[in-house]
């Protein structure tokens, strides 16, 4: 598993597993809505009234419509690493 994928895969898998409705914003501003049906290294299969294959390089943001649990040890470690890298020590 690539270093940059250690948070992405558990996040998408939890969305898929819990059937969480999502809004996916593309880099060109288009908003897509549906449920993550499947995904791989390059694409997300988004299901609504039809299934759409969305290339990850075209995605800006994935917004879940409700809270959900990403229960994965790797995801927790990846987030902790991200927080450590971006902590400037200024707790205002």
Curated annotation (Swiss-Prot):
PROSITE patterns, A to Z: SM
One GO molecular-function entry: RNA binding
Keyword RNA-binding in annotation: yes
Database matches in Gene3D superfamilies: 2.30.30.100
UniProt keyword RNA-binding, yes or no: yes
Domain Sm: start-end pairs: 9-68
Keyword annotations: RNA-binding, Stress response
Subunit: Homohexamer.
Protein family membership: Belongs to the Hfq family.
Name this protein carries in UniProt: RNA-binding protein Hfq
Species per Swiss-Prot/TrEMBL record: Shewanella halifaxensis (strain HAW-EB4)
Gene: hfq
């Amino acid at each position: 598993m690539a270093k940059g994928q250690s948070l992405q895969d558990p996040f998408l898998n939890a969305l898929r597993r819990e059937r969480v409705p999502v809004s996916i914003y593309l880099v060109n501003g288009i908003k897509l809505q549906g449920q993550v049906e499947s995904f791989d290294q390059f694409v997300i299969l988004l299901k609504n009234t039809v299934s759409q294959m969305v290339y990850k390089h075209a995605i800006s943001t994935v917004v879940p419509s409700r809270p959900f649990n990403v229960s994965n040890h790797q995801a927790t470690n990846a987030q902790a690493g991200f927080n450590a890298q971006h902590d400037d020590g200024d707790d205002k």
